[in-house]
Curated annotation (Swiss-Prot):
Belongs to the acyl-CoA oxidase family. Expressed in glia. The gene is Acox1. The modification Phosphotyrosine is found at residue 544. GO terms for cellular component: nucleus; peroxisome. This is Acyl-coenzyme A oxidase 1. Homodimer. It comes from Drosophila melanogaster. A motif (Microbody targeting signal) lies at residues 667-669. The lineage of its organism: Eukaryota, Metazoa, Ecdysozoa, Arthropoda, Hexapoda.
Length: 669
């Protein structure tokens, strides 16, 4: 329970809710058991004095912040060890501590050990042979070695074929000789690389018998196991301060004639024999499995970012009173302004839809991964395309949504104590890492153009793109009646036509004599538009299917709330793409006006439950870390308390006055 009395406006909002917030909290957590596990983890980690901050981390130097973050990361790691020993750890525990809300509460600027668990270990599991897993995994799980994943370079990121780091096989010693041949070949950005990890999975061009074989992952020791000094041939360090994720210890890595044994190349999918003979993978896409795994996880992370930002902004908007609506009445809660509602409520709805979609994509990834393990690669392209476009769309929308929430809080949202700067810095980073968003959309678009050609040839398409075949057989969209189902179908029809245009434009360029790659570049805007609408059509379909299904499983009161969430999401999404709808569907001015009035009505129906909905995200005050968004709603008191922690305010007269200002003021005398 909060130590201070709850702000009366906030308490009034909670008392008039039409549903039980705990019911939704359990749903959001994934069920009663996971909800209880979440509470237990919060008690274990958030009540530990060693994991609390006396001084806001925004006042720390870059060096101090790293040391502070590493200290906490090691405490977390020790607790994870104990949970593993007690058999109480699981995927949800790692998700919560490394990418979820609990981890962000403890390590607000990121965890320097995160990539060890999120990338290094999964890469060994996904790309190492059974023998290699036996050799490396126990050491990694027990943190006898600390690893990271070194793929991105100073000169190349998402374009993997452009990576310059090179590994040449020396058959005489059965070793690989790894080099970064230029400055642009230096590995750049891996989390924990700067001063934390002593091993890395290094992705490099593979050469055997003088021939280029493609990219391959190698386990490379970076630092001495005892002294932690860089190994011979290793040039390594931290890349410096950034917009966000300031505690992650992103690093750089140069390699000069670094030799690693043959068995240090992860060989589950491709092999090099002792004599240098190369055995190619069954499918080159298999080597990208780790990135697909992370992209799927990131979709759920974007939902958490929106949940945090919308919780802070909604609670603040219930407490803040300003700008009379009726001149004869007192200043209202700013959440009563329709324009404020339009800023906030769609972000809450997106958080719920992104979480629902993220859970579905995660389940889909696990199913398809099982199929891949059995040698069935049929659905791999579909999974790759979906994970790419959804990662791009959800991260972009989440970053924009966080910024919208910040702006909705006026000047106070600009303060560090609001926590918006940190949330935004962490969220916008997702737009770049694990595949820059534009490139991700282009990856999806290539798949869409391919399946469009298959549909023209009468081939049966997988369910997530079957709407393309439907649109080919239906040249005109009929019966847009404004129902939620018709909005979903309209999204699919618009998406199919966007893909049609991209396909036709590429074919036109080919007929003009351009090669496939040049044609694709010339048609880049058509391609990204097609991928964007494909992802949004998938989100609309998933929201419609899953939220209606959930509404049949919960209480009637919560069911009504979920239906309002769904309607708000779909109507808002439709109006945000109304130009595309008007292009491909015969909508009248009256149809659009009806949608706009309907959006206004959705906001009104959403309003009574807004605070209780964000309460249902069940975000601990330590997770929010915001003077504006605390559960008790005492915004101004929390803001003022934050100023008292400012080191500048610890002395009545700062020394700089006597050193600089006073001589300056007296200089004219």
């Amino acid at each position: 329970m909060p130590a201070k009395p709850v702000n009366p406006d906030l308490q009034k909002e909670r008392s008039t809710a039409t549903f039980n917030p705990r019911e939704f909290s359990v749903l959001w957590a994934g069920g009663e058991e996971r909800f209880k596990e979440k509470k237990a983890l919060e008690k274990l980690f958030l009540e530990d004095p060693a994991l609390q901050d006396d001084l806001p981390i925004s006042y720390l130097s870059h060096k101090e912040l790293y040391e502070h973050s590493l200290r906490k990361a090691c405490i977390i790691g020790e607790k994870i060890r104990k949970l593993r020993a007690d058999g109480e750890d699981g995927v949800d525990t790692y998700n919560a501590l490394l990418g979820g809300s609990l981890g962000s509460a403890i390590l607000k600027e990121g965890n320097p050990l995160a990539l060890h668990y999120v990338m290094f270990v999964p890469t060994i599991m996904g790309q190492g042979t059974m023998d290699q897993q036996v050799e490396w995994l126990s050491k990694a799980w027990d943190c006898e070695i600390i690893g990271t994943y070194a793929q991105t370079e100073l000169g190349h990121g998402t374009f993997l074929r452009g990576l310059e780091t090179r590994a040449d096989y020396d058959a005489s010693t059965q070793e690989f000789v790894i080099n970064t041949p230029s400055l642009s070949a230096y590995k750049w950005w891996p989390g924990g690389l700067g001063h934390t990890a002593n091993h890395a999975v290094v992705v490099a061009q593979l050469y055997t018998k003088g021939e280029f074989r493609g990219l391959a992952p190698f386990i490379v020791q970076l630092r001495d196991s005892d002294t932690h000094r860089p190994m011979p041939g290793i040039d390594i360090g931290d890349i410096g301060t950034k917009l966000g994720m300031k505690g992650v210890n992103n690093g750089y890595l140069g390699l000069k004639n670094v030799r690693v044994p043959l068995n240090n190349m992860l060989m589950k999918n491709q092999q090099v024999l002792p004599d240098g003979t190369y055995v190619a993978p069954k499918n080159s896409v298999l080597t990208y499995g780790t990135m697909m795994f992370v992209r799927c996880a990131l979709i759920r992370d974007t939902a958490q970012s929106l949940a945090k930002a919308s919780t802070i902004a909604t609670r603040y908007s219930a407490v803040r009173r300003q700008s009379p609506i009726d001149p004869n009445q007192p200043e209202p809660q700013i959440m009563d302004h329709t324009t404020q509602q339009l800023k906030l409520f769609p972000q809450i709805a997106k958080a719920i839809v992104f979480k629902t979609t993220g859970d579905g994509i995660w389940n889909m990834y696990n199913v398809i991964s099982g199929e891949i393990e059995q040698g069935n690669l049929d659905r791999l392209p579909e999974m790759h395309a979906l994970s790419c476009c959804l990662k791009a769309i959800c991260s972009a929308d989440a970053a924009a949504g966080v910024e919208t929430c910040r702006l909705s809080c006026g000047g106070h949202g600009y303060m560090d104590c609001s926590n918006f700067p940190t949330i935004y810095g962490m969220t916008t980073a997702v737009c770049t890492y694990e595949g820059e968003n534009t490139v991700m959309l282009l990856q999806t678009a290539r798949y869409l153009v391919k399946v469009y050609g298959q549909a023209l040839n009468g081939e049966k398409l997988v369910p997530t793109v079957s709407y393309i075949s439907d649109a080919i057989n239906q040249t005109k969209f009929v019966n847009f009646d404004g129902s939620l189902r018709s909005i979903v179908k309209a999204f699919q029809f618009v998406a199919a036509n966007k893909t049609r245009i991209a396909y036709e434009q590429i074919e036109l360029r080919r007929k003009q004599g351009y090669g496939t790659e040049v044609a694709a570049n010339l048609c880049g805007t058509f391609l990204t538009a097609a991928a964007d609408l494909h992802g949004r059509a998938f989100l609309a379909q998933t929201a419609y299917t899953e939220l209606l299904a959930l509404s049949r499983e919960v209480s009637p009161e919560l069911a009504e709330v979920l239906k309002v969430v769904l309607e708000l999401y779909l109507v808002d999404a439709c109006l945000n793409r109304i130009g595309d709808f008007l292009r491909f569907i015969d909508l009248t001015d009256q149809d659009v006006t009806k949608l706009e009035v309907r959006l206004e009505n959705c906001l009104k129906r959403f309003r009574p439950n807004a605070v209780s909905l964000v309460d249902s995200f069940d975000l601990h005050d330590r997770v929010l870390d915001s003077a504006l968004g605390a559960y008790d709603g005492n915004v101004y008191e929390h803001i003022f308390e934050s100023t008292k922690k400012n080191p500048l305010n610890k002395e009545p007269v700062n020394g700089a006055f006597h050193k600089y200002l006073k001589p300056f003021m007296k200089a004219h005398l």
